Amino acid sequence: MFIAMADFKLLLLILILLSLFELDLLHFHHDFFSPFPVKIGLLLISIFFYAYSTTRSKPVYLVDFSCHQPTDSCKISSETFFNMAKGAQLYTEETIQFMTRILNRSGLGDDTYSPRCMLTSPPTPSMYEARHESELVIFGALNSLFKKTGIEPREVGIFIVNCSLFNPNPSLSSMIVNRYKLKTDVKTYNLSGISVDLATNLLKANPNTYAVIVSTENMTLSMYRGNDRSMLVPNCLFRVGGAAVMLSNRSQDRVRSKYELTHIVRTHKGSSDKHYTCAEQKEDSKGIVGVALSKELTVVAGDTLKTNLTALGPLVLPLSEKLRFILFLVKSKLFRLKVSPYVPDFKLCFKHFCIHAGGRALLDAVEKGLGLSEFDLEPSRMTLHRFGNTSSSSLWYELAYVEAKCRVKRGDRVWQLAFGSGFKCNSIVWRALRTIPANESLVGNPWGDSVHKYPVHVT
């Protein structure tokens, strides 16, 4: 286990002070200032600062991140999607009309991406094609990340992969170990949910370490091939994408890192049956597997978000907003007055908003519920339009959009808000450590070739 440079200096100071017990270096006439009491006092002070430095929480830095951009040959327009659906000879005419209405109102553009096997007529999904999709996305994001940071794969001590619907054997993390020939003691994890919290806790237990998070989803084997309407919406919204994020707890990385993690708030409402079953992978009446979305999904998401914000608010809101909340409680609870629901003004504490691009209806609900502006939701809506719903990696496409627009300034706070089945809601707050200049903002950025076209009006 390595010793951080700051801890090493403190340890060295203690050793020097201990040596003073053998060397009579201090000479004072007053008994109070005799060498022995002075040495004891200095030693106790040093021990205190050493204990403080080793027990306090170490900062977690976001060195950089990278999002995968598939090739143009994988682009799928609305017309291509409908031709694919008809060519598959799996869907009834009513189902195709239903998916047409969903896609036309989805907020997706014509430049999103699909697995190559889904663009053939008929589609040819297989385990081989599913692995091919994951390899393209994961290795594409990782290669870009290692190039941007200059960090070698073998320098990374922790790898975490989160992918909900594709869990092959060997695992996706083992695929990374094999591809980059990682060390035998590397720590690897495969998750089906959001993973920044796990990475942060692992970094607390492993000093002087890099941790890489890979967020992706697999579309090849996830496409629903039946006619149950509750399972057809994911077909219309989900697209190929993935991101890789480099985190560090090394103090020397602060200078070059983009962001510092300030807060993580996780909310899990799985104890409620309504929340637990609102997004569920299961078989339809004919035994065809798909992800069924409840009509109450937006309501469930709003309820989970409310619980999450109750915990997040006290951590980030200014004193003025906290006083407003206390006043609201006094009026509504103590005096039983009919008052409008209290909605915190999160624009007072966050400069940039990266809301999970799960769908147009979800973004509309969050925008209205939190009183956000079109500008605040621009990164999320444009990500949905350009890349579709790429699951948890959409948060990173959104942050990449903000950087591509040269909006990130030193000291800005970024709020990433994610939703997941279960039902879960996670808030992640970052503070920008430096201004991202124009000559850096487009390097390895998936928006590099298209950001000048955005924002666009989405009907």
From Swiss-Prot:
CDD domains noted in UniProt: CHS_like
Entry annotated with the keyword Transmembrane helix: yes
GO cellular component, one term: membrane
Location in the cell: Membrane
Keywords, sorted A to Z: Acyltransferase, Membrane, Signal, Transferase, Transmembrane, Transmembrane helix
Pathway of action: Lipid metabolism; fatty acid biosynthesis
Transmembrane intervals: 32-52
Protein name per Swiss-Prot or TrEMBL: Probable 3-ketoacyl-CoA synthase 14
